[in-house]
A protein has these predicted regions:
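Conserved active-site-adjacent core of cysteine acyl-enzyme catalytic domains
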Residues: 36-169
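Active-site-adjacent structural segments surrounding the nucleophilic cysteine of cysteine proteases
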Residues: 1-60
Length: 170
């Protein structure tokens, strides 16, 4: 799983959706960074800054600065599709992981703030996460260390044969 830190110096001060009142990638950009990590995992060349720029132009944020998850997939519509955005389900998480698809989950940090991380694997009963926030430098670590239940899921799937046309032309 590619590691992208939402507070990377290059983009941490960029406003979400180009609107300063929405906050910055560094402070509130965990959703954008998590989506960028999944897209990068699927071979799509992006980072939180590029995805934020795209979403800003594509009206990809609500008036409160929340990400329209389906519009993020418009970044590479021939490569990835938005599949699910709803309540948590361990069956859906496990099914996605068994098919090689990471899952974005919303958790609530001990401070009460919601945060998005990417479940990239499983070790026994522990889900292993890539955290675009403060835990970014840790690599994969157990979700349970955040001390939160999973509140919601978002996931994307790669579009099958995304490169078949390129291969056929060679």
């Amino acid at each position: 799983m590619p590691s992208l830190h939402q507070a990377e110096e290059k983009w941490r001060d960029d406003p979400l959706g180009g609107i300063e009142a929405n906050g910055t990638l560094g402070g509130e950009g965990c959703a954008v960074a998590a989506a960028a990590m999944v897209f990068k995992f699927y071979g799509i060349d992006t980072d939180p800054q590029q995805l934020n720029w795209f979403l800003t132009a594509a009206d990809g944020y609500t008036e409160n600065g929340w990400l329209y998850w389906d519009r993020a997939a418009w970044f590479a519509p021939d490569r990835v599709r938005h599949v699910y955005e709803d309540l948590p389900s361990y069956q859906l998480i496990d099914s996605n992981l068994s098919h090689g698809n990471p899952v974005i989950v919303r958790v609530r940090l001990r401070s009460g703030i919601t945060h998005f991380v990417v479940i990239a694997g499983k070790d026994g009963f522990d889900y292993l996460i890539a955290d675009p926030g403060a835990g970014a430098a840790r690599g994969l670590y157990p979700l349970r260390e955040l001390g939160s239940d999973i509140e919601a899921l978002r996931f994307y799937e790669p579009i099958a044969n995304a490169n078949s046309q390129v291969t056929a032309n060679r």
